[in-house]
């Protein structure tokens, strides 16, 4: 779990990025001092080195929520358009699952 010092450095870096200011150890330390955050002196430099050459704004906007695969359905939708109506009919046949009865599985509630 991240410590309060780490989180404070992350927030300071995000503030600097939002203001479109270069992220340096000195600027992170200045923000932390202005916010009266107690921190070890190595944290600002560590975060500045980690974010050196990284486009933080692009990094934030490209983070996925992990909810699903966005590009895969778009690619699958493009394939039937190029192939015609025949592949679309085949996918409908594959999507129909075979229904199974719970009776023959032996999972009765009151058995």
From Swiss-Prot:
Gene3D superfamilies named among the record's database cross-references: 1.10.10.1410
Keywords on this record? Answer: Ribonucleoprotein, Ribosomal protein
Q: Which InterPro entries match?
A: P1/P2_N_sf, Ribosomal_P1/P2, Ribosomal_P1/P2_euk
Where are the residues of the annotated region Disordered? 65-111
Which intervals of the chain form a coiled coil?
A: none
Single GO biological process annotation from the record: translational elongation
Q: Which GO terms describe its cellular component?
A: cytosolic large ribosomal subunit
* Comp. bias regions, Low complexity: 65-89
Q: Where is the signal peptide?
A: none
This entry's Gene Ontology molecular function terms read: protein kinase activator activity; ribonucleoprotein complex binding; structural constituent of ribosome
Q: Which family does it belong to?
A: Belongs to the eukaryotic ribosomal protein P1/P2 family.
Function of the protein: Plays an important role in the elongation step of protein synthesis.
Oligomer and partners:
P1 and P2 exist as dimers at the large ribosomal subunit.
What's the protein called, per UniProt?
Large ribosomal subunit protein P1
């Amino acid at each position: 779990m991240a410590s309060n010092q780490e989180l404070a450095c992350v927030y300071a870096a995000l503030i600097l990025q939002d203001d479109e200011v270069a992220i340096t150890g000195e600027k992170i330390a200045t923000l932390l001092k202005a916010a009266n955050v107690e921190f070890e002196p190595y944290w600002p430099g560590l975060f500045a080195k980690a974010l050196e050459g990284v486009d933080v704004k692009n990094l934030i906007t490209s983070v996925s929520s992990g909810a699903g695969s966005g590009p895969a359905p778009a690619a699958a939708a493009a394939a039937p358009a190029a192939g015609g109506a025949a592949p679309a009919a085949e996918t409908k046949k594959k999507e129909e699952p075979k229904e199974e009865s719970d009776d023959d599985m032996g999972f009765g509630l009151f058995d």
